[in-house]
């Protein structure tokens, strides 16, 4: 539907009628594809997939946003790609598909190119990864020419071969080296001199004019929408009025991340050092006093933060050992010290700006001093709106960070994704937190986090269950006799490892063990490594290539892989290498400022926040086991809190939410079931 589509339809009402007629015609095309054409192409008929496509078209006809939980195996990517690609063609407009992982982006690239020929389409497709995935030629040249640098051969050879993305370079290239040569601070204005040789520049430029399919991450789409809502030019062609958010259970976290500011002590000292270097041709002694004052104020403020962190660690319950975020106490001297630090940074920045204005004829860059000025502006805004902000502290080794974001993430998500001219399709395998009640009740936690407009403006779909035969192919084992994992943590680790070894003996390895805390994972790995077990024990390594560890796990069929974080949802391993998923501890959220704020505004903190968070992550973890129609195996939950007697308040809602209904608390029954599986006999 290009400009010719509107010829003769001058009023808004006429255009709406013409658009709806086009969508009705598209609905017929979708039906024809699934009922007549897909079988001719040898595509497997999946009821949930077809229903999903038809419901998306209905939502578009009714001018509604649309949310759907689509179980593993229904083919949700094809389910939304068919109507979305046809929409792009018929309306001659770009469509944007955003995910939360690079793995799904790359899979969608393959899926789009598989679906288009089936529909007789040939749309432009742009894969827009985050900027740090791309080589910056300018930074690479500077690094290669730096006499103090020692560029590894993998980098030299890759550049000579013309590699432009991180995935092109060998895995042995250290991430620390890549961070010295990748794109870090892109802008169309400042990077214009590189437009002919920078792949990322070409990608960003093409996004402005495409009328095809844009595949990006949720962070990038959020930044695009934030610009549009501020009345600025977006990052993508503004004609795009259909958005798809896959892995939508992460959307509120991604939007929160996009609105989060963080300032570390090391970062601020680095800015001051760089700003002073920019004054190398001037008399630096004239601003050395302001520099000392700023550095002293920074040290005083961050020492206060470190003291707060240590106090919380000393006084906290066992759960605090898992914390990544610590609470910021704004009732003491911290606000006064923050105000003094901000004033000192502002004074230093103002003094440096005077020199930069004197040097305008030389057209030299004073980027670091501009950065200091931006820090001061951000901190001033924080102090002005402190009651509207969530503030916390993060500790990374010796570096301490002040981190903050607006409290009203729900309102921000709603304004960005549901209050513009665009219509948004949201999907995930884990959007619901209950299986009974009204659709609003089943999707209640998702709605509370995103402000999805259920009703006239938004359609909630009946969840589409996975077609996989879970109860024939899988069984869940749960414990009822172990120590409490938080109140009796040391005893839990000891007894939990003993139970883990019993479970591993049933499957002879072949297991993915999921942890909620890195410290638990490392402790269990240390214990298992000393046991001289008949299978290799692997562990997710910080900074290592995920592909390398996963490939080793796949190739060594009986190996055991310990993981946390992204391993709960970011991996897909088919076959008998993964025949046993072990949940070492129920994934309740760790108490932190974000969770505590959600709890503070909930009627029932446990049932309205902590349990839904746990259920969604537990469903993600269990979903690692059955990835196709032939996969079989067991899931083992080493946590007594799902025992039948005495039941916890969340006992029934948790069990009802899980796709595998076949369960036992007997290791003997578990062994008998596993030994009867085809994979155990191979």
What are these regions (language model features)?
Residues 62-82:
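Walker A/P-loop
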Residues 479-490, 541-643:
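Conserved RecA-like P-loop NTPase helicase motor core
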Residues 482-516:
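Conserved interdomain hinge at the start of the Helicase C-terminal
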Residues 80, 86, 106, 110, ...:
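Signature of the SF2 helicase/ATPase Hel1-core->accessory helical subdomain module
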Residues 57-58, 78-91, 111-115:
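Walker A/P-loop NTP-binding motif
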Residues 2-44, 91-214, 218-222, 281-289, ...:
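A substrate-engagement module of RecA-like helicase motors
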Residues 188-212, 222-233, 348-474, 479-480, ...:
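A contiguous, basic/glycine-rich beta-loop/short-helix subdomain that forms a polymer-engagement track
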Residues 516-541:
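Conserved helicase motor "Helicase C" RecA-like lobe of SF1/SF2 P-loop NTPases
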